[in-house]
Structures are given as structure tokens and as C-alpha cells.
Amino acid sequence: RSEDGGTKIYGASGRVKRPGLWELPMGTTIREIIDEHALGMQDGYCFRGVIPGGASTDFLVAEHLDTPMDFGSVTRAGSRLGTGTMIVLDDRTCPVGMVHNLEKFFARESCGWCTPCRDCLPWTAATLEALEDGRGEEGDLEILESHCWMMSPGHTFCALAPGAAEPLGSALKYF
């Protein structure tokens, strides 16, 4: 079933009928976790995407629902397994607002030691807030993309900024 053996604690939060944690075989698919263990999306909501491994992992979308939740499969799909606690995004929640919340969290948690965290994260959060409120400006998306590059591995002292860049970059790609 999976290239990784044993079991793992998986979780699902968001507009699912039964948010929670479950110990399941490694490699259980995203679809099975959402549909069978979290009992699907709440009435009136449809699946839009998922952050499969916690706040610092890339979004996956409907084409990835049959991805086994193991290290190799999730990596090949374009994200990371991380904690295995999925944040499920529905079709009525604004992806910009969701990513804005995540970037505010990362900006608040930054120690401020390196430039990408100290400068990019607060600016990124403010730009996402402006976009969400309809105050975006031409060129904002390109600047956000450049911030993803500046916050990528090799440009920072620790993994905080690269973790913040993952959901931002994938949201720019998918939404």
C-alpha cells in the first residue's frame, strides 16, 4: 500500500463533517481520509484544496486526492507529508484570506534575524490583506512570487521562511 511502513496519525480540519485525528496505515489516500474518516465536506461546501502536512506545506488540489499520504508520494505530488494534519480548503473560503492568515502567523513567529523573514513576511502578509480587501495593485502577484524565491531554502538562516513560502507559492500556482 505504501513505500513507507507502519501507521501514522493523520488529521483533517476545515469544513469537513468530522474534524479529528486518526491512526491509519501509512499511505492512506487524501480522499480516504477526507471522505471516510472526516466523513466528507460539510453540506453546502465542496473541496477546493488541501495543505497536507500542516501550515508550512504546499497546497494540493482535486487532481491529488488519490495521492497516498506517505513521504514519497506527497513529495512527488508537489508538497510534503509534514505532520500529516491536513487543512482542508473549501470552495467558499477565500484562498487569499487563508494564506494571509498563514503568512501573518509566520511573520509573528519570526525572530527577525534574517532579511527574508524580517522584511518579506510582514510585507507579504500586508499585501495579501490588501488583495483580500480589494486594494491590490498591479504587480503585487509578481512581487509575491519574488518573495517566495527570496524565502526559499538557501536564502534564510532557518526553515521558517521557506515554510511560509510553500503555501504562498502553491496558492499563487493553483488559485
Q: Each predicted region: which residue ranges?
A:
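Redox cofactor-anchoring modules in respiratory/redox and cofactor-processing assemblies
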Residues: 1-175
